[in-house]
Amino acid sequence: SLVYMVDDLIKKSTHSKSGFYLNNHKELRATLKELKSQKQKTLLIGVSFGLLDFVEEQSFQWPELTVMETGGMKGRRKELIREELQQILKEGFGVEEIHSEYGMTELLSQAYSHGDGVFTCPPWMKVLVSDEDDPTLLKSIGRGVLHIIDLANIYSCSFIATQDLGEINEDGSFQVLGRVDASDRRGCSLMVV
């Protein structure tokens, strides 16, 4: 899950300021100010609704900060298209790009975007799209509902159908366009309340 992955990154960083700042914007803001003053290279990973809450409370301008959003809104806020979300975050943090992670609890692998909203997969992960009305019509290029094959899932199901709408490009990269209407709220970030 996202929480497990980030916890592992925190432990591996061994930096004294690495940690979870769940709903503690005051401490996070103080930590970021300190790291900025020390010119410490910093990665801030947050769920979309949490990062929005943070910058709407008070913007924090740090052009050298690397910000990675993940997890979507999970029903906690109005769904935004990725471009709108990223524009708000860019302005709120004073950065030129917002990185993104696309993954889910059922998968061992993730796809990453380096600021342009276009996700790339590792070689053992493939994304297909199906027709919204007929999930048996799969294709490797075009728009539709995203389906993921993750060969890293050795001892579990290595293929899933999501309720995410997307578009796959000729090179296998893809964009997430939103959710299927009336789809379930889901995600590991809902585990923490």
Residue map of PLM features:
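Phosphate-binding loop of NTP-binding sites
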Residues: 1
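Active-site glycine/GP-rich loop and adjacent strand/helix microenvironment
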Residues: 4-193
